[in-house]
UniProtKB/Swiss-Prot annotation:
Originating organism: Hordeum vulgare (Barley)
Annotated protein name in UniProt: Antifungal protein S
Function: Has antifungal activity. Inhibits the growth of Trichoderma viridae and Candida albicans.
Entry keyword DNA damage: no
Iron-sulfur among keywords: no
Length: 37
């Protein structure tokens, strides 16, 4: 399965996914796709 994290805030956030790979800095409007087994 693939999960997509979308930062809909107007500021930078730090998203985390454990144990899928730690964290990711997301600027406003940025997305992060995470593949889970």
């Amino acid at each position: 399965a693939t999960f997509t994290v979308i930062n809909k805030c107007q500021y930078t956030v730090w998203a985390a996914a454990v144990p899928a790979g730690g964290g990711q800095k997301l600027d406003a409007g940025q997305t992060w796709s995470i593949x889970x087994p």
